[in-house]
A protein has these predicted regions:
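Acidic, low-complexity interaction regions
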Residues: 205, 243, 250-356
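A positively charged, amphipathic N-terminal helix/segment that binds anionic biomolecules
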Residues: 1-140, 144-257, 261-268, 276-277, ...
Length: 356
């Protein structure tokens, strides 16, 4: 496909148009700068049209294919993130199984550090991070954390940092294996926290693209770190509503939803509106407003987002997935309201049977 190529020139780069001419127009050069293409990337191809959905392809330092999309396309893709939940559910066991295995690798091998980041991603719900945000806004995520952002004391890690939108985060987690790995990463020179040693023993800094490549290597699918936040948001709000139980009136149901969303937003580090719009499956909330809610989880199988109970899906997760699928089928088959029919103002509680 015709496009623009980046070529090394002195300490910087030249950009070559499809006709082989060096691009010098300031507005074009500003556009390329705004794409924030890492200097280490090679075989860089840039779309000739600024509104093309795929803006950049390249190879990273390890030879892996990388992509940059137009923000508008990313917004469209975000609209399908709730569908991506089900794709993640198919392979989450693979990710958890591989993470548990890779954490035990010797030294600070690449896959060991990637597994550690993914473990923390799922356990703490800290954003994956972006070099763009770290440089422009001094806000951090897992892959952009600095050594100063974590304190390790025995088996406990405590992360304190400024996140997206200036929100201050203080997150503690206790795990002996993870604490030891993070402490060893801290001991490597360089301000970045997460680093690994490549096959030649050279230090490499972990980037978000590395973590996504690790997830895609495991699953063979386009799974990214961001998918974990949608998964967690839906599971957390379902957990809160499940504990609250059905409401007696629609007004009470709306209040309960707000409370559940607020708890979830606090865990994710989002505002209520952002959390509700982007990280909670809408079928879950519409079902609750109609009086349909998951029954309480038996005490012996209660699920905690902070505890890993093996690679398989946990009982709460399986229940939520089955519930949402059931609601989607119900909504698909539900006849449209006639001109004379009115929705009930008071929801009728109905309990779904727990999964066997």
């Amino acid at each position: 496909m015709p496009g623009i190529r980046r070529q090394k020139h002195g300490r910087g780069f030249n950009y070559i148009d499809p006709d082989g001419q060096v691009i010098r127009a300031p507005e074009m050069l500003n556009r390329f700068k705004a794409l924030v293409i890492p200097p280490a990337w090679t075989d860089v191809w840039i779309c000739a049209h600024e509104d093309g959905h795929l803006q950049v392809t390249a190879r990273d330092a390890r030879g892996r294919k990388q992509y940059r999309y137009h923000p508008g396309f990313r917004q469209h893709r975000d609209g399908t993130k709730f569908e991506r939940m089900f794709e993640l559910s198919d392979v989450l066991w693979k990710i958890r199984e591989r993470v548990e295995s890779d954490i035990t690798l010797p030294g600070l091998a690449r896959d060991k550090v990637m597994a550690t980041v993914v473990w923390l991603l799922e356990t703490t719900l800290i954003r994956i991070g972006s070099d763009e945000y770290a440089k422009a806004n001094k806000s951090f995520g897992l892959t952009t954390l600095r050594r100063r952002h974590v304190a390790v004391k025995g088996n406990e890690l405590r992360f304190e940092f400024r996140g997206k939108s200036g929100i201050q985060h203080a997150v503690a987690v206790t795990d002996r294996r993870i604490a030891r790995i993070v402490q060893r990463c801290q001991e490597l020179r360089g301000e970045e926290l997460f680093k690994y040693l490549d096959d030649e023993g050279k230090k490499q800094v972990v980037q978000a693209e590395d973590v996504n490549a690790y997830l895609q290597d495991i699953t063979g699918r386009d799974i990214t770190a961001k998918d974990f936040r949608t998964w967690a948001g839906t599971m957390l709000v379902a957990q809160a509503l499940r504990a609250t139980g059905p409401a007696e009136t629609r007004r009470e149901a709306e209040k309960n939803i707000v409370a559940a969303v607020d708890v979830t937003a606090k865990r994710l580090g989002n505002t209520r509106s952002v959390c509700r719009k982007y990280y909670i499956h809408p079928a879950l909330l519409s079902a609750y407003l109609e009086g349909s809610v998951l029954p309480p989880l038996p005490e012996r199988t209660k699920w905690s987002n902070r505890k890993h109970s093996g690679p398989v899906l946990r009982q709460h997760e399986m229940d939520v997935l089955a519930f949402i699928k059931s609601r989607l089928k119900h909504d698909h088959n539900k006849p449209a309201l006639s001109a004379t029919s009115q929705p009930r103002s008071t929801p009728q509680p109905q309990a779904n049977k727990p999964a066997a």
